[in-house]
């Protein structure tokens, strides 16, 4: 229905000061890093056209949408991305905080639940204490490239599935595409592929948007 909540996207606009900081992080840190070879969104050297061209001449196309893509990416995932870049744990924590937004609800346990170095010490500092979970907000300048970084392991696994099944795989933000030129492929086999995609999404703490899954032939 037209008024269904999933038909709307919530865009979080950061304050002027925070936006300036996030733009700096985007320009001086995130934009310098390579993205997944399977990802075609948020990359100045790639486009939706390039993504579509990878599937030209296919006989079957499967499309799966990730539900609440940005909001499904958590502060701890962002923290580990900065840490993998070589930043110290505390600085990674600070950067992750700058790039994420606190959820309005529900409350959750503090950061002591996470196995971060020195996090128990940080929680003794008032401004580092957490009472609610944080997520990657759609609308922040840093969110697109951070989402691509977080998705690299997922893309790698999806690429392995695609290669094994004789498919081409691409991702454009929250849209996953798999195609094959195999004329002997059928809808029953497509449903088995989709199940593998759903299982992998769940393994990475994402949810598929069942209503947007499509099989085209």
For each predicted feature, which ranges?
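Active-site flanking loop/helix segments enriched in acidic
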Residues: 5-8, 132
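Active-site-proximal segment of RNA-dependent polymerases
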Residues: 18-72, 100
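Conserved polymerase palm-domain catalytic core
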Residues: 56-173, 177-216
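A structured, charge-rich N-terminal accessory region that forms the first stable segment of a protein
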Residues: 1-2
